């Protein structure tokens, strides 16, 4: 039964992967350069979004600030359409010169994860550094408590020591040295 459940889960995962396709919506193959929307300068993210809006494209666009990466120009922003619906099969047609989605390339996260530190800003490689948790420090008042137990402290009367004569409570033995 365990093997059957594992095979069923793998089969469903393969079907879902074939239906939805991954990055890009229907009719868009992977990443799209900014130059295809009409502007090829190093203007920034705002200029990339405004050029996409001026070209009459009303679809939402995800802006990825990218440096030199394989297959793209130097210093261009990349606009990738955001897929809004997940219905039906994606009609992915590879664009000129590309082979569809290359799974190992491109940024894994376009939005920086919480608590991550940006290591290589030109390539969108985020590496998370987990800092040790800082706890709030509370200073508690320290006041002496009552003794836990009453300890017996002998007053230099070390029991019955018969070498020194008779017992005398006011006399301390073996403390001051020999008396003559």
Swiss-Prot record:
Superkingdom classification of source: Eukaryota
UniProt-annotated location(s): Secreted
Keywords: Secreted, Signal
Keyword RNA-binding applies: no
Annotated GO CC locations: egg chorion; extracellular region
Signal peptide positions on this chain: 1-21
Xref: InterPro entries: Chorion_2
Family: Belongs to the chorion protein S19 family.
Function: Chorion membrane (egg shell) protein; plays a role in protecting the egg from the environment.
The protein, known as: Chorion protein S19
Originating species: Drosophila subobscura (Fruit fly)
